[in-house]
Amino acid sequence: MKLSNKTQALHDLIAPAVQACDVNLWGIEFIPQGKRSLLRIFIDKPVDETAEPVLNEDGETELGRGIGVQDCVRVTQQVGAILDVHDPISGEYALEVSSPGWDRPFFQLEQMSAYIGQQVALRLISAVENRRKFQAKLLLVDLENEMIQVEVDGKHVLEIDSHNIDKANLIYQD
């Protein structure tokens, strides 16, 4: 789980602007697409279990948790201004800002720690036991050794080096 140099540079550039909007920068995807690239920014904020539901300025009920439309608008405006000034992306691009959603992608190993015991989808760089794709239960996140442990098919436990993870996301289960 390593960011490309381009993505890391974009992350470092926009992180202060995102934090100034009172949200956390969950991750960035930069996808070159011919003439028009895509910069997708995922934002999140901690859950406030004690918050009472309130009506926001748009008349929408907010439960004191999660990302709302106004959060996305604020971040889009702040980040858009920074990108206009620094111009780190050559050519045209679309800017998308959203929450990570129910099937949240993981960009850093630390992010997975909160989801131990849940199902994750993994795409690996190099095959492990002749497979590059897994749906598995997350058993352990070892930050010191930079690895995870997952249970595949309800019985088989694998240890996977975090540097071998190309893509990982949570599998939403009702």
From Swiss-Prot:
A GO CC term attached to the entry: cytosol
GO biological process: ribosomal small subunit assembly; translation
Key words of the record: Cytoplasm, Ribosome biogenesis
SUPFAM superfamilies membership: YhbC-like, C-terminal domain, YhbC-like, N-terminal domain
Main location: cytoplasm
Localization: Cytoplasm
Disulphide-bridged cysteine pairs: none
InterPro entries to which the protein is assigned, alphabetical: Ribosome_maturation_RimP, RimP_C, RimP_C_sf, RimP_N, RimP_N_sf
Stored NCBIfam families: PRK14631.1 (NF011224)
HAMAP family: RimP
Function summary: Required for maturation of 30S ribosomal subunits.
Protein family according to the UniProt entry: Belongs to the RimP family.
Protein name, UniProt field: Ribosome maturation factor RimP
Annotated organism of origin: Acinetobacter baylyi (strain ATCC 33305 / BD413 / ADP1)
